[in-house]
Amino acid sequence: MSVITPINTVLCPSARAGLAAIWAVPCNEVIEIIIDPLLHMVSNVILNVGVEWQRIEFEPGTAYLMQEKLIAKGYTEYVKQTIYFEEYGLSPTMRNALEDLNGNCCMNVIAEDEAGNYHYCGISVRDESELNDNLRTADGTSETGADPQTDVAKYTETLACVCDFYALITIDPIDFNPLFWTKPDDEFWTIKGN
C-alpha cells in the first residue's frame, strides 16, 4: 500500500506556481541586458533614459508563469513561456495600464513568483552578441459585469513566447538603476564615481 503525503503550505512554503507581480517594458526601450552565462542570470538591465518598469500586482491565485519544453523535429528544444493573469473589478487606472500593455507587440517582463524569486521572461540568448526578445500579448478576454447573474467585471490576459530556454533568474527590478552604473573596457560593472 502506498503512503501519500499531502502537499500543503506547511510542507511546501516556497511554491512557485503563482505570481505576485510582473514588471513590463517595451522591447524598444531596452538598451542592454547583462547576462551571466555561467549562472544563467540576468544581472542588470539598461533602459532608455526616463523609462521605468511598469508594475502590475496580482491577488493570490490569479496569475501564473508556465514554462513548457517543446521539441521540434525530434532534437531542437524550445521552451514556451506563458504568463496568464486575471484582473477583477477593473479600475480606470488598471484598464489604461492594460490597454498600454496590449499596444506593445514585443516586451520584456520580469515575473515575481509567490516565493519571491524573479524570472526574466521572453528572451533568448543565441551567443554573446545576439539576443532575441519576442514576448507579446496572446489571448485576452474581458467581461463587463453588466449581468451579475452570468459574469463579473474582469480582464484575462496571456503573454506568450517561444524561447531557447527557461526564463532566467534575475533580481528585483526596483534595484535596476543604470544611472548609477558604468561599464569600463574590462567588461566589469562599477558604481559611478568609484
Describe these PLM feature segments:
Residues 65-128:
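Structured, beta-strand-rich domain cores
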Residues 7, 27, 35, 43, ...:
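Intrinsic-disorder/low-complexity regions
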Residues 12, 27, 105-106, 121, ...:
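Generic recognition of cysteine residues
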Residues 27, 38, 61, 88-92, ...:
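Generic structural motif
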Residues 126-194:
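Mixed-charge, glycine-accented linear interaction segment located at domain edges/termini
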Residues 2-84, 128-150:
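Solvent-exposed edge beta-strands and adjacent loop segments
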Residues 4-5, 9, 24, 31-33, ...:
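Hydrophobic transmembrane signal anchors and adjacent membrane-proximal interface regions, especially
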